[in-house]
Design a protein with these regions (language model features):
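N-terminal Sec-pathway targeting helices
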Residues: 1-7
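Substrate-binding/active-site clefts of carbohydrate-active enzymes
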Residues: 24-49, 56-67, 74-207, 245, ...
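Conserved, mostly hydrophobic/aromatic
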Residues: 35, 61, 71, 88, ...
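Active-site-proximal helices and loops of the catalytic beta/alpha 8
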Residues: 105-109, 113, 123, 128-139, ...
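Bacterial N-terminal signal peptides
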Residues: 7-14
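Bacterial Sec-dependent signal peptides at the C-terminal "C-region" and cleavage site
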Residues: 14-26
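Loop/helix patches that line or flank the sugar-binding groove of alpha-linked glycan CAZymes
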Residues: 27, 306-315, 320, 324-456
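Alpha-helical packing segments of well-folded alpha/beta enzyme cores
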Residues: 57, 100-104, 186-201, 217, ...
Length: 456
């Protein structure tokens, strides 16, 4: 099968060309590993991936070349993905304890790595104290913490996508609502919450705290709610400013709710550090030279000084790249673009071994996304110590699972195969780390007349 492209990166190492490279100094060679900890490695045999399991596998991530880890939300939730909180202040017991979290963070830092935490504090479930205490109680100290549709506070507002409830894969019905981000009390609470995860023991040192946060579904005007406008200036920027006062080195990454948005307004109005290069992701998957260049010149070329774009191929809300593009050589080609074009590359766990998965259509349930979030495949057989089959025997997403024995898509099958996708990822990441031009340079297109050659 002919490749649509031959990748031809032009590596400019001569001293006379250093002027084109960025004067900014991000973490040299930073490579983020975006991991659903529930699906990664189970340390205690309950089929749930957990914090101790992730800590056990840090040597694997370092061997791959990963320098930073981005976790899914940690807090207590009825949702398997933990995006809608029952309690922001409690870690999901299936992940472990607060001490397990601190042990993980300390070990990450001991190894010279960084750790980021996904935070979605814009919604809460009916199990949250704000809901429980405020609904029907105008005297509640939480009366302005969530939005209501009526003056008597009997009906909480809808949440994202104008939903009132979610049907869990395990049969749970989960009610949720939107947090009132215009409340000064809510802003103060968020400052305290984020600050706690940055410095749990409040000693002014950050070895036991996260290095930054991912802000899920961030918007200036949240979900079209009439009262939740101008949030960049009134909520996000004050929050971020307060966090930087605590630790100037903290990194704030925002996921733009509109994936066609380049994110420049987030940089300007909310002072976000990093955005996701969705446009470049779509262009890479298209293997369309014109689209790749157009998006790279905007996303990588026009991002303001001091700000960065995260470059990626897949994430937890998308079909796995290996299910979209089944050709191994094209998978490797996309990886080359991911690591060599610029920005901060991010790998979604299992991407490095070509894990497959698409969204299901099994009715109104959050189980439809499980195909995109299956257990990391450590073994040829698909079974063994640490396999995180938390969705086992729970429904059609188990009987239709992508994971198969002896399919070539496991670490065990690929780690000693010099031609495997895993080995290509490993070699490409280490190549990037060895050259400042690749790890810290700015993207610059080098024009050529061949429609099948991309040079930069």
């Amino acid at each position: 099968k002919n490749l649509f492209y031959i990748l031809m990166p032009v590596l400019l190492f001569l001293l006379t060309n250093w002027m084109i490279w960025s004067q900014r100094e991000p973490v040299k060679g930073e490579v983020i590993y975006h991991v659903c900890q529930r699906s990664f490695f189970d340390s205690n045999g309950d089929l749930n991936g957990d914090l101790n399991g992730l800590r056990e596998k840090l040597p694997y991530l370092q061997e791959l070349g990963v320098t930073s880890i981005l976790l899914f939300p940690l807090y207590e939730s009825d949702c398997y993905h933990n995006y809608f909180a029952n309690d922001f202040e409690q870690i999901d017991s299936e992940f472990g304890t607060m001490q397990d979290y601190i042990d993980l963070v300390n070990e990450v830092h001991r190894r010279g790595m960084k750790i980021y935490l996904d935070m979605e504090t814009q919604y809460v479930t009916s199990q949250h104290v704000w809901w429980k205490d405020a609904v029907g109680n105008l005297e509640s100290k939480y009366s302005d913490f969530i939005l209501f549709e009526d003056e008597s506070h009997q009906t909480p507002a809808t949440m994202v996508f104008d939903l009132r409830l979610l049907n869990g894969f395990d049969g749970k019905v989960i009610y949720a609502t939107t947090v009132n981000l215009k409340s000064k009390n809510v802003l103060d609470y968020n400052i305290a919450l984020f600050s706690y995860f940055m410095d749990p023991n409040k000693d002014g040192k950050f070895n036991d705290g996260v290095d930054g946060f991912r802000l899920d579904h961030a918007m200036d005007h949240l979900d079209g709610k009439p009262t939740l406008t101008n949030l960049f200036a009134e909520f996000w920027k004050p929050l971020i400013t307060s966090l930087r006062q605590l630790n100037p080195a903290v990194k704030i990454v925002a996921e733009q709710a509109n994936w066609s948005d380049y994110g420049f307004e987030y940089f300007e109005k909310a002072d976000i550090d990093r955005m996701f290069g969705f446009g470049l992701q779509q262009a890479i998957l298209s293997f369309n030279k014109t689209e790749i260049i157009r998006n790279a010149e905007v996303i990588l070329g026009q991002t303001p000084a001091g700000k960065e774009q995260i470059v990626f191929i897949e994430n937890h809300d998308m079909d796995r790249f290996a299910s979209v593009e089944k050709d191994l050589q094209r998978q490797k080609l996309a990886a080359s673009l991911l690591f060599y074009m610029g920005g901060v590359p991010s790998i979604y766990y299992g991407q490095e071994i070509g894990m497959k998965g698409k969204v299901y259509s099994f009715g109104n349930t959050d189980g439809n996304d499980i195909g995109r979030r299956e257990a990391f495949d450590w073994y040829t057989s698909g079974e063994g110590k640490g396999m995180s089959h938390w969705y086992k025997d729970s429904g059609a997403w188990w009987t239709n699972a992508n994971q198969k024995a002896n399919d070539g898509i496991s670490l065990e099958e690929q780690e000693n195969d010099p031609n495997s996708l895993f080995q290509f990822y490993k070699q490409t990441i280490h190549m990037r780390a060895q050259h400042h031009a690749l790890s810290s340079g700015n993207y610059l297109n080098v024009e050529n007349s061949n429609d099948h050659v991309l040079s930069f």
